[in-house]
Amino acid sequence: MDAKLSSTGGEAQTEQRQPGPVFVRNSRDADVPAMLAIYLHHIRRGVDPGIEENEFETPDAEDLKRRRKSMQRRKMPHILAEDGGVVVGYAYAVPFRKRPAYRYTVKHSIYVHNDHLRHGVGRQLMGALIDACAAAGFRQMIGYIDSANRASLALHEAFGFGKVGYLPSVGFKFGRWTDTVMVQRSLGPGATEPPRT
């Protein structure tokens, strides 16, 4: 996987061509409606029937634009995958914790369009996101995964994430308690040397 990473104006630029039609690049404001549609599909799919939308917070396009710009100002990657000009997934990293001691650790999220699941989009986004986070100087990457999401667990394992925590019964949906697995991987030299300040 060859990623072209450069820094311009404090923002890591990620443009990654893969074999096949999917292209990974930094997100833009014009991509927000497509990203929002992907996000809302996954949020609504994860909510019990009978729970009204006004009972949980859903962002609108302006919220997502603000979040995206805030992430980019803090040198946090916000990337997407497109296939033939159509947005098929996106990924981003945010600070793991707000306190300064944790500034070299990020947590990440990846969302893939429902019609493009199991086509390698998540794999391409994960590789590009790891590369962008490492290039930005982050040293650890954290993820939280529903324990029933075997595909996501396998993807993270394939990219060197190890299981570092298990949170039993922290969610309730579809009539059952759900567990969360916490995964982590090192970026760049990880903890073998102090960060460059």
Where are these predicted regions, by residue range?
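Acyl-donor-binding surface of acyltransferase catalytic domains
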Residues: 1-18, 164, 185-187
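Acetyl-CoA-dependent GNAT
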Residues: 4-7, 56-115, 126-127, 186-187
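A short beta-loop-alpha structural element at the N-terminal edge
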Residues: 23-37
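Conserved GNAT-fold acetyl-CoA-binding loop/helix
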Residues: 36-67
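Conserved catalytic-core motifs of GNAT/GCN5-like acyltransferases
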Residues: 92-95, 142-145, 157, 162-179, ...
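Conserved acetyl-CoA-binding loop-helix of GNAT-fold acetyltransferases
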Residues: 118-132, 150, 154-158
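Conserved GNAT acetyl-CoA-binding A-motif
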Residues: 133-145
